[in-house]
């Protein structure tokens, strides 16, 4: 059937004699100290009482003249409360992200096909699911800011999430 013959055989690798391994089999590390108390409760981690009331205020704009900047000046530092043993070191106390009364724009956040259940109104932003961090709109509402949400773009060819149909 095959006039060329068989394929050449590959040489086998020589057997290595067992010897001392390059790395030690066990590595002795110091044991971590045991926990002395339970971790803090969820409500203790997210208390806004660690920020001084004056630290989270927004500087007011003075009467601007033509050509002046329309942006608010950045605060140089935020004064925080004394760090004690009650605050876990993994969490840093900070002020609100959105100043109260400000308006936050969330582009493409409104989905025309989304339904929020019975009794939902147009001004209702649902809370985040358990175990999930809040999105920008939910954070702004929690901190007293206004939220403006624009509709997600969709067309006949790109589709949408409103349960439409496809013609093949």
Curated annotation (Swiss-Prot):
GO biological process: positive regulation of RNA polymerase II regulatory region sequence-specific DNA binding; protein destabilization; stress granule assembly
Effect of residue 4 to A: Does not affect ubiquitin-mediated degradation. Abolishes nuclear localization with the protein located in the cytoplasm
Keyword Phosphoprotein assigned: yes
Biased composition, class Low complexity, residue ranges: 1-13
Tissue: Widely expressed. Expressed in spleen, thymus, prostate, testis, ovary, small intestine, colon and leukocytes. Down-regulated in multiple myeloma.
Residue positions, PTM Phosphoserine: 77
Chain spans, region Disordered: 1-25
An annotated GO cellular component: nuclear body
Alphabetized GO MF terms: DNA-binding transcription factor binding; identical protein binding; mitogen-activated protein kinase kinase kinase binding; p53 binding; protein serine/threonine kinase activator activity; protein serine/threonine kinase binding; receptor tyrosine kinase binding; ubiquitin protein ligase binding
Effect of residue 77 to A: Loss of phosphorylation by HIPK2
Gene induction: Induced by cellular stress.
Modification after translation: Ubiquitinated. Ubiquitinated by SMURF2, leading to proteasomal degradation. Ubiquitinated by NEDD4, leading to proteasomal degradation. Following DNA damage, phosphorylated by HIPK2 which promotes DAZAP2 localization to the nucleus, reduces interaction of DAZAP2 with HIPK2 and SIAH1, and prevents DAZAP2-dependent ubiquitination of HIPK2 by E3 ubiquitin-protein ligase SIAH1 and subsequent HIPK2 proteasomal degradation.
Record keywords, A-Z: Cytoplasm, Nucleus, Phosphoprotein, Ubl conjugation
Motif residue range(s): PPAY: 39-42
Cited Pfam families: DAZAP2
Function: In unstressed cells, promotes SIAH1-mediated polyubiquitination and degradation of the serine/threonine-protein kinase HIPK2, probably by acting as a loading factor that potentiates complex formation between HIPK2 and ubiquitin ligase SIAH1. In response to DNA damage, localizes to the nucleus following phosphorylation by HIPK2 and modulates the expression of a subset of TP53/p53 target genes by binding to TP53 at target gene promoters. This limits the expression of a number of cell death-mediating TP53 target genes, reducing DNA damage-induced cell death.
Identification of the protein by name: DAZ-associated protein 2
Gene: DAZAP2
